Amino acid sequence: MFTLKKPLLLIVLLGIISLSLCEQERAADEDEGSEIKRGIFSKFAGKGIKNLLVKGVKNIGKEVGMDVIRTGIDIAGCKIKGEC
């Protein structure tokens, strides 16, 4: 059993080292790719994404505002009628 531990440990260490080197190369390649993608998407999709987010926030604001108004009207009507 002891004779198998050293070669097994060596294989594991070499595997970890090669894996870390591959991850570093992959990260460098992804950085270069993201810079290229960022340049393409910022020209075409940047304004579209911004407009989409602004419209979404406006719609959410309108819905929340309407809910607050409805709740306020319901409470006021309840107090006027004396049902609360």
Curated annotation (Swiss-Prot):
Record protein name field: Esculentin-1SIa
Keyword set includes Metal-binding: no
**Family matches, as InterPro entries:** Frog_antimicrobial_propeptide
Q: What does this protein do?
A: Has antimicrobial activity against Gram-negative bacterium E.coli ATCC 8739 (MIC=6.3 ug), against Gram positive bacteria S.aureus ATCC 6538 (MIC=3.1 ug), methicillin-resistant S.aureus ATCC 43300 (MIC=25 ug) and B.subtilis ATCC 6633 (MIC=25 ug). Has no activity against fungus C.albicans ATCC 90028.
User: Which Pfam families does this one have?
Assistant: FSAP_sig_propep
GO CC field: extracellular region
Q: Pro-sequence positions in this chain?
A: 23-36
State any GO BP term from the record.
defense response to fungus
Keywords (A to Z) from UniProt: Amphibian defense peptide, Antibiotic, Antimicrobial, Cleavage on pair of basic residues, Disulfide bond, Secreted, Signal
Intrachain S-S bonds = C78-C84
Q: Which family does it belong to?
A: Belongs to the frog skin active peptide (FSAP) family. Esculentin subfamily.
The subcellular location is: Secreted
| UniProt keyword Secreted present | yes
Tissue specificity, please? Answer: Expressed by the skin glands.
Q: Where is the signal peptide?
A: 1-22
Which species?
Answer: Odorrana ishikawae
